[in-house]
């Protein structure tokens, strides 16, 4: 048995065990008395998957290219007067943002300033306390969530892609998944057993088939090996649609070459200049 075959066998075994543990944990969570045991089972599953996460052939790189965005109006997304608090904790107040066709905006702020919350509100996944988000003519929104909550972990890789690529047949969907290194039986795995890097690639693949004209990207280079990160940076750099980016990665900001910066929590806007680059890694 070659090393590669052995690694594949070990990975399959680990995934089966992890899937069984996660299924059992889901059942136990329904009972309050077993909540701690369920949490421990989920952690065991995570450790199993972490042990085999780096076993893919390193010379394979996901081919990431965003297609031309769908046609849209001059300002496909606009937000006015957004505020958000959690209990007595005020996250941000009175944020205005107009995303014009093809514009590039980077959102900066210290941890806890509400960057992820703002993207979730813009994506329609969380309501603001005050203010409103107004979609413009032809808006087609793509959202990349750093915690991968846009993935349905109960569905397979292929099923997740099919929800994003309703206009594609299964053969074409499988081809695109193959370009993101999901081949053969990989497409039949439940998303819940994927490693962090695999979830990132699947979420990016779903963005690619969406033909979005506005991308909301929350830490899109996390969990990627250097070669795949370079592919993501190139895809961002060549994308013709509008982008709102949250990142700690200076390389991602330089790839975007933003026109504007939005500073949280006060919601002030400025034209981008390199003086802001020092804030990226601190954000």
Please place each PLM-identified region on the residue numbering.
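Coupling and communication elements adjacent to P-loop NTPase active sites across diverse families
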Residues: 2-94, 98-101, 283
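ABC ATP-binding cassette signature C-motif
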Residues: 1-5, 66-283
